[in-house]
């Protein structure tokens, strides 16, 4: 399955919530009718079956983190092998992706932009350049913008924007040094209440 390259707001309207795919403190404004389907005359969304609700939730989370279907299923399988709650394990695995951590630290305005920074070798983890967006970051890992990339205007703009957002409690950030520490795995209470991971567990458990 190819990565979606179309209008970002269309995806948010399809899922009925802001997926934070566009840069900005909040991507959705009053002009975007989030409760209607995509299109100029988008109809209100029909009532979904239980399966439809579960599928939509999985699609929503997959799109938030920019994960393809096969990758997402692999994350779920890994989550089932870990101790503890499968749904929470899944979210922690997604949050631990390097591209997501770069986004959370404020070095990029979107996860897609963070993925590009990683792929272009602009990110260093524990002193070593890492160019695989899906690399898992572990507690106490130090993530830094590579020295020659620190002059990029988009990174400075992203940090300015991040200063207006609530900072993740599980990440320590030094904006001046363009460096951050992934202090711990996020707890469920740290993450969005708009995600119902149990629906995803129910979907894949069938």
UniProtKB/Swiss-Prot annotation:
Function, in words: One of the primary rRNA binding proteins, it binds directly to 16S rRNA where it nucleates assembly of the body of the 30S subunit. With S5 and S12 plays an important role in translational accuracy.
Residue ranges constituting the S4 RNA-binding domain according to the UniProt record:
96-156
Signal peptide positions (record):
none
Kindly provide the name given to this protein in its UniProt entry: Small ribosomal subunit protein uS4
Give the matching PROSITE patterns: RIBOSOMAL_S4, S4
Q: Is Ligase a UniProt keyword of this protein?
A: no
| Subunit structure as annotated in this protein's UniProt entry | Part of the 30S ribosomal subunit. Contacts protein S5. The interaction surface between S4 and S5 is involved in control of translational fidelity.
Q: Into which family does the record put it?
A: Belongs to the universal ribosomal protein uS4 family.
Alphabetically list the UniProt keywords: Ribonucleoprotein, Ribosomal protein, RNA-binding, rRNA-binding
**InterPro entries found in the cross-reference section:** Ribosomal_uS4, Ribosomal_uS4_bac-type, Ribosomal_uS4_CS, Ribosomal_uS4_N, S4_RNA-bd, S4_RNA-bd_sf
Domain of life according to the entry:
Bacteria
GO BP terms in the entry: ribosomal small subunit biogenesis; translation
GO terms for cellular component:
small ribosomal subunit
